[in-house]
């Protein structure tokens, strides 16, 4: 029975369970509020810790907060240099010019060492500054190379040559056609003119003049050029000069004589001006420092024949006083007169005497013309257009040379004045070799090779 009771339960215990359940549902559902209010409140209490343990925990917390702050600052500093700068697009030329980039880097490193380090700036400003620096370095390097290879042609050699050159006007035409007259003319220019004037003087000279004469001045004539030649036919100048087809009515030309130094120029202008050579009064003047035109001592002569010569004016105005020079204005293409001239006297009082010859005939006969004589006036030339050369690029010294060259040099040199010349190396000439290379020796005449070649030639000849 006990096994059955264990399996199916005891009848007594079932009765007790039913009684307890019945008692539970039989009780009233109303809750007594007094009991609830009088019930004590339960409070959970934490276990107490020691004071030493609390202090250690506080120290660890403060140390952890400090270490976290330091780590954050280090991370921020590492992140700033790690930021990549924006790469700007560069031209193909900059990528190709490795030398320019290398020089810019070297210059940048040297500047960074000298200058103190500043605070880091924005990435955009750094990239812009680098681009500007590379552009400036590139322009400076390439600019110096290109500018150093070009030079402005200021004709400095021609200006130095003009300092040693004298102008000789009213030279007889026979100098070109006759060798004898040419030798006499060259002898006149290469001789000291002061020796001839000493014979005519009374012998009373100042000490300064004696000291100047004792100085050794060499009158070495390097070259003589003839200009203002009038030809009879309209042929090229070289062809007409070779055939000597000169104009019959024009019996005078102009010449330029170049000396070895500038010392004889002043002496020749002083003593040779107005000298008679083959019945012609020579007019000698310096090329770089010509004698000024004085309006008070000169007269204007108009209504001249186009074929008029200087000697007729010398003879016509010689009774008025000592003449310094006679200048007939001529055409640059035909080298014939334009119909007017200037006569300058040594004394201004001779001008009043020359004015009395107004409307008087210079020649007798059919070709006689009444001259129109008047005082000279200073007529300033209208300034032409400025040259195409940019004077802003030139310094003061170059501008002075340019201005002198325009007044002194001829047409051919003035046309090439101010051009940019590229500097080139010297061309190789025959016989010039480098010192490293050894010249090959000539073949010996008694050697084996020469003997065999001679024997071979004899065999073929037979």
Swiss-Prot record:
Residues 297-378 form the RRM domain. Residues 47-59, 125-134, 198-211 have a biased composition (Acidic residues). GO terms for molecular function: rRNA binding. Gene3D superfamilies: 3.30.70.330. Keywords: Nucleus, Ribosome biogenesis, RNA-binding, rRNA processing. Residues 137-146, 383-397 have a biased composition (Polar residues). Residues 438-455 have a biased composition (Basic residues). It is found in: Nucleus, Nucleolus. One of its GO terms (biological process) is maturation of LSU-rRNA from tricistronic rRNA transcript (SSU-rRNA, 5.8S rRNA, LSU-rRNA). The keyword Cell membrane does not apply. SMART domains: RRM. One of its GO terms (cellular component) is nucleolus. It comes from the Eukaryota. Residues 24-148, 191-215, 381-400, 432-462 are annotated as: Disordered. Residues 108-124 have a biased composition (Basic and acidic residues). CDD domains: RRM2_Nop12p_like (cd12670). Belongs to the RRM RBM34 family. Involved in pre-25S rRNA processing. PANTHER family: EUKARYOTIC TRANSLATION INITIATION FACTOR 4B/4H, RNA-BINDING PROTEIN 34. This is Nucleolar protein 12.
């Amino acid at each position: 029975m006990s096994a059955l009771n264990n399996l199916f339960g005891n009848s007594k215990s079932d009765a007790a369970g039913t009684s307890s359940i019945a008692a539970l549902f039989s009780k009233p559902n109303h809750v007594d509020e007094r009991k609830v209010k009088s019930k004590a409140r339960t409070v959970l209490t934490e276990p107490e810790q020691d004071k030493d343990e609390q202090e250690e925990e506080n120290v660890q917390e403060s140390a952890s907060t400090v270490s976290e702050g330091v780590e954050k600052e280090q991370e921020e500093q590492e992140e700033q240099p790690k930021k990549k700068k924006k790469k700007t697009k560069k031209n193909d030329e900059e990528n190709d010019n490795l030398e320019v980039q290398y020089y810019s880097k070297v210059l940048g490193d040297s500047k960074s060492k000298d200058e103190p380090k500043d605070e880091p700036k924005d990435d955009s400003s750094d990239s812009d500054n680098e681009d500007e620096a590379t552009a400036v370095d590139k322009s400076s390097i390439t600019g110096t190379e290109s500018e150093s290879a070009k030079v402005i042609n200021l004709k400095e050699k021609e200006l130095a040559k003009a300092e040693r050159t004298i102008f000789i006007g009213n030279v007889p035409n026979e100098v070109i056609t006759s060798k004898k007259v040419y030798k006499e003319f060259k002898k006149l220019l290469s001789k000291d003119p002061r020796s001839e004037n000493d014979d005519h003087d009374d012998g009373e000279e100042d000490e300064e003049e004696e000291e100047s004469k004792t100085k050794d001045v060499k009158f070495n004539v390097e070259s003589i050029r003839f200009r203002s030649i009038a030809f009879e036919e309209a042929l090229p100048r070289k062809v007409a000069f070779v055939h000597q087809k000169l104009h019959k009515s024009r019996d005078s030309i102009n010449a330029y004589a170049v000396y070895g130094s500038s010392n004889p120029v002043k002496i020749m202008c002083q003593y040779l001006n107005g000298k008679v050579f083959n019945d012609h009064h020579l007019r000698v003047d310096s090329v770089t420092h010509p004698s000024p035109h004085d309006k008070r001592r000169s007269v204007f002569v108009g209504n001249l024949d186009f074929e008029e010569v200087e000697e007729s004016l010398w003879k016509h105005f010689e009774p008025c006083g000592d003449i310094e020079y006679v200048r007939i204005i001529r055409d640059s293409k035909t080298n014939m007169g334009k119909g007017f001239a200037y006569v300058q006297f040594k004394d201004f009082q001779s001008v009043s005497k020359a004015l009395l010859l107004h409307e008087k005939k210079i020649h007798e006969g059919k070709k006689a013309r009444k001259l129109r004589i008047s005082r000279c006036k200073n007529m300033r030339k209208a300034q032409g257009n400025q040259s195409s050369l940019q004077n802003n690029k030139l310094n003061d010294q170059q501008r002075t040379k340019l201005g002198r060259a325009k007044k002194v040099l001829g047409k051919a040199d003035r046309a090439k004045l101010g051009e940019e010349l590229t500097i080139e190396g010297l061309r190789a000439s025959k016989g010039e070799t480098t010192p490293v290379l050894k010249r090959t020796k000539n073949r010996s005449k008694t050697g084996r090779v020469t003997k065999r070649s001679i024997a071979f030639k004899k065999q073929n000849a037979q």
